[in-house]
Curated annotation (Swiss-Prot):
SS bonds (residue pairs): none
Entry protein name: Putative lipoprotein LpqT
Compositionally biased intervals (Basic residues): 206-217
Upper classification of the organism: Bacteria, Bacillati, Actinomycetota, Actinomycetes, Mycobacteriales
Subcellular location: Cell membrane
Source organism, top-level taxon: Bacteria
Length: 252
């Protein structure tokens, strides 16, 4: 994407849109490839990142709240320069859940997993992006019996980003999760999209996508974007977010 970028050490006190998408499905091993998905498949108690550290991870939302950042959920379609959406793959359909906050977009394959969810939040007030990224993986690490597969703090298409994937227990199921947070920065305002992809063990990963409408080279980066993704496979139409598949990473 093209456009001017603000200094990455802070965000101006302008609007920030946050989108979060989640896909849930089962993790399955299919070969001795790297990264080692076999290590995250067991449902027996494991030593998580939380138990091996002296400090409990602080979720991103809690960190932002602690530094005075305020915000509210908004519809993904309300973003102007940046459009974030989840196309519906074959066999998937929109899913309604009364327990999910308004303005949340959610699709599912069947009545449970896998699912993909997209949420957008508008944030206000200056804050340190680099410091915020340190909290981008906390939600995943705090999941029950979470076992990390891999993680990264490399930029995503030139944007500050934090990614983590692994597995955790939920209601008697072992879920694979893939989580990425991205802060696209620029002039004028900030947008923070997040995606999460979950799938239950024993099922084949499916693909969903985030789309930027129009030529992504014409989209000006404004403020920051947080992208959170969990499990399976998500991608953007123009700026792709790849999720593991058996052919390349050991998942069926």
């Amino acid at each position: 994407m093209a456009g001017r970028r603000c200094p990455q050490d802070s965000v101006r006190p302008l609007a920030v849109a946050v989108a979060v998408a989640t896909l849930a499905m089962s993790a399955v091993a299919c070969g001795p490839k790297s990264p080692d998905f076999q290590s995250i498949l067991s449902t027996s108690p494991t030593t998580s990142a939380v138990s091996t550290t002296t400090e409990v991870p602080v979720p991103l939302w809690k960190y932002l709240e602690s530094v005075g950042v305020t915000g509210e959920p908004v519809a993904p379609s309300s973003l102007t320069d940046l459009t974030v959406s989840i196309p519906t793959p074959p066999g998937w359909a929109p899913m309604k859940n009364p327990n999910i906050t308004p303005n949340t977009e959610m699709i599912a394959k069947g009545e449970s997993y896998p699912t993909a969810m997209l949420m957008v939040f508008k944030l206000h007030r200056d804050f340190d992006i680099a410091e915020a990224l340190k909290h981008g993986t906390a939600d995943a690490r705090l999941s029950t019996n979470f076992t990390e597969l891999d993680s990264s703090t490399a930029d995503f298409n030139g944007f500050p980003s934090s990614m983590i994937q692994g597995s955790y227990d939920l209601h008697g199921r072992r879920l694979h999760t893939w989580n990425r947070i991205v802060f696209p920065t620029g002039a004028g305002q900030a947008a923070l999209p997040g995606a999460a992809h979950h799938h239950e063990s024993g099922q084949r990963g499916r693909q969903a996508r985030f789309r930027h409408r129009g030529d992504h080279r014409r989209i000006r980066r404004r403020g920051k974007v947080i992208v959170r993704t969990v499990g399976a496979q998500l991608s953007e139409q123009l700026t792709r977010i790849e999720f593991p598949q058996c052919s390349s990473h050991g998942l069926a």
